[in-house]
Amino acid sequence: AKDGDVKGPAGCMKYKSGDCRGKTCCDQQYLWYKWRNLACRCFTVEVFKKDCWCNDIS
């Protein structure tokens, strides 16, 4: 495998590739020399503002 390769449904979202709310993150992505499990995670970036992206939950 090489960096950026993914496992998951067609059209799934890669690591930090945009807002994942209501979308499907890839199951896994090859990052930093190993397979990482991805899931949509939301973080408070400012008061009353959340950003959500596909994050490494390995």
UniProtKB/Swiss-Prot annotation:
Q: What transmembrane ranges does the database entry give?
A: none
Would I find Transmembrane helix among this entry's keywords?
no
Question: Which Pfam families does the record cross-reference, listed alphabetically?
Answer: m_DGTX_Dc1a_b_c (PF17491)
Would I find RNA-binding among this entry's keywords?
A: no
Annotated localization? Secreted
| One Gene Ontology term, aspect cellular component | extracellular region
What are the cysteine partners in each disulfide bond? C12-C26, C20-C40, C25-C54, C42-C52
Record keywords, A-Z: Disulfide bond, Ion channel impairing toxin, Knottin, Neurotoxin, Presynaptic neurotoxin, Secreted, Toxin, Voltage-gated sodium channel impairing toxin
Q: Which GO terms describe its molecular function?
A: sodium channel regulator activity; toxin activity
Name the InterPro entries for this protein.
Beta/Mu-DGTX-Dc1 (IPR035290)
Organism's domain of life? Eukaryota
Summed up, the tissue specificity of this protein is:
Expressed by the venom gland.
Q: What does this protein do?
A: Acts by delaying the inactivation of presynaptic voltage-sensitive sodium channels (Nav). Acts against insects and cause a progressive spastic paralysis.
Family (UniProt) = Belongs to the neurotoxin 26 (DTX) family.
Q: What's said on domains?
A: The presence of a 'disulfide through disulfide knot' structurally defines this protein as a knottin.
Q: What is this protein called?
A: Mu-diguetoxin-Dc1b
